[in-house]
Amino acid sequence: PMPFQADRLQLNNMAFNSPNTEWDLSAQKVTGGVSPWQPEAGNVLGKNAQIQMSAGSLTLNGVPATNVLIQGQLNGKEVVLNTIGADMARGSLTGSALRNADGSWVIDTMRLNEIRLQSDKSLLDFFAPLNTIPSLQIGRLEVTDARLQGPDWAVTELDLSLRDLTLSK
């Protein structure tokens, strides 16, 4: 444990950076709190805490977003995101999800509206991150009017509804 801790860490219009970690994170205009706050080496938020934060801008593992809202909790290596909301790729994302301790994801609900995303990756490389997680379970995924484009591939006016899908290695 670090030599300091608090019942609650309150952030007001702060910058938050966590490079060279499992989640490469950079956020600006962060307001919110972590309760209790018990930081550890390599884990600035601690292992067990309630989190509630908003950020004017945030980049997570190279993916930028603005007007971000996150509510959830950290339970050891498990991350529960009860509420996620963000503007990204000229559209919006809302949902709730759980990342298990083994790195697998359970997406209870996710809605992507009017996403406009251009990538320099081939279609195979674009979906390659899905191969890095042990499993992905989707309760409900709704995509409305999405446009995705890369070299030699494009998807336009995509409307998609998925329910009860599991992808596993």
PLM features: residue spans?
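Membrane-proximal interfacial segments on either side of biological membranes
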Residues: P1-V68, L74-K77, G91, S96-K169
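Repeated loop/turn-to-beta-strand initiation elements of outer-membrane beta-barrel proteins
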Residues: V79-L81
